[in-house]
């Protein structure tokens, strides 16, 4: 590799500065060691979280995550594998999907905007368009991420 790269191990919780940018990280999934990040700059706050626990799986971590996301301008959330991916599985229609949990979190944390990322590669453009309609019908300022999207 021609570049000189430096890696820093993050502990949880952690707060640090990168110039004028404030970063806070917390553990959001003990099984995967996943961290959630709150990034603040000039009065704007972005929260990035993937692989999050459900409220029922770990109430304490879920509560910490809600505090991290509280009143964020933007929550980027893992909406992996919607029910549209699993239409051939009857049980999928009866289970709560990750995008629904993301909307629930956005509402509980009073998040202004929600972007769902990490879609299944088997989803067609039509399926993603249908998902976008579902998502916006539940949270008007929510959208699914797409290639080339600018935030």
Which sequence ranges carry the predicted segments?
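Binuclear metal-dependent hydrolase catalytic cores
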Residues: 1-47, 53-58, 66, 125-151
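Cap/insert and terminal regions of metallo-dependent hydrolase folds
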Residues: 56-141, 145-147
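Short beta-strand/turn micro-motifs composed of small residues
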Residues: 49-50, 118
């Amino acid at each position: 590799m021609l570049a000189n790269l430096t890696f820093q191990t993050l502990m949880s919780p952690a707060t640090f500065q990168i110039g004028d940018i404030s970063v806070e990280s917390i553990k959001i999934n003990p099984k995967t060691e996943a961290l959630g990040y709150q990034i603040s700059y000039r009065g704007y706050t972005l929260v990035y979280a993937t692989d999050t626990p459900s409220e029922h799986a770990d109430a304490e971590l879920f509560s910490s995550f809600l505090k991290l996301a509280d009143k964020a301008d933007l929550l980027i959330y893992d909406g992996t594998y919607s029910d549209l991916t699993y239409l051939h599985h009857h049980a999928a229609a009866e289970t709560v999907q990750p995008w629904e949990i993301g909307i629930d979190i956005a509402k509980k944390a009073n998040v202004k905007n929600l972007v769902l990322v990490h879609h299944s590669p088997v989803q067609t453009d039509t399926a993603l368009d249908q998902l976008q309609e579902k998502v916006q019908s539940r949270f008007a300022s929510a959208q699914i991420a797409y290639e080339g999207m600018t935030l």
